[in-house]
């Protein structure tokens, strides 16, 4: 789904506006192996404070689900960089799983991650995603047992996304040892590519994780902080940061 050594930026759709999100995506796409696009939700419990605030800004600005699909549709006119929708189950449930995935596919989405859908309850999601040709991505955390990691790998058709513990996402000064321990286990167990998202904020972090075996590195909070500070005018700062993190 992405080439080895990729940077995978995360942005929240609609923060601070749908038009701005499209501009931001186009500003960073040339340095991105894939892009995660978050669907705002009113109770984003699995995210840290930075990304939670991003969800709230988007919702306060009038975000509607259709805006996300329109953003991807417009993005597809200019770029073929893979887009992975990152969402909670509630927005999917409100629309209906089949309709949500169908709309995602029609707009040009490549993959989908439902943050709070455990792999053991994902059979319908897997079936519909397979029918629609949408890649599936599942999360694994440091406390995920090996047997569960095998199940996650088997269910994932895009990549396995290794994260810090729920609610602790955020830019850090150093990558915690738990990241490297989980990555080591995942490389032993998983047949899929693995992407790691552990508070990456510097190129040094990206290099450390890639050298430790990650196929891709996700960066979210460091970019969302830029949007929080610069709002509609974050485009150039985002481009510079993503280029720096990608080592280009």
UniProtKB/Swiss-Prot annotation:
GO terms for cellular component: cytosol. It is an enzyme of class 4 (lyase). It comes from Pyrococcus abyssi (strain GE5 / Orsay). CDD domains: Tryptophan_synthase_alpha (cd04724). The keyword Lipid biosynthesis does not apply. This is Tryptophan synthase alpha chain. Its EC number is 4.2.1.20. Keywords: Amino-acid biosynthesis, Aromatic amino acid biosynthesis, Lyase, Tryptophan biosynthesis. The active site is at residues 36, 47. The keyword Lyase applies. Disulfide bonds: none annotated. The alpha subunit is responsible for the aldol cleavage of indoleglycerol phosphate to indole and glyceraldehyde 3-phosphate. GO terms for molecular function: tryptophan synthase activity. NCBIfam families: trpA. It catalyses: (1S,2R)-1-C-(indol-3-yl)glycerol 3-phosphate + L-serine = D-glyceraldehyde 3-phosphate + L-tryptophan + H2O. Tetramer of two alpha and two beta chains. The gene is trpA. It comes from the Archaea. Belongs to the TrpA family. HAMAP family: Trp_synth_alpha. Pfam families: Trp_syntA (PF00290).
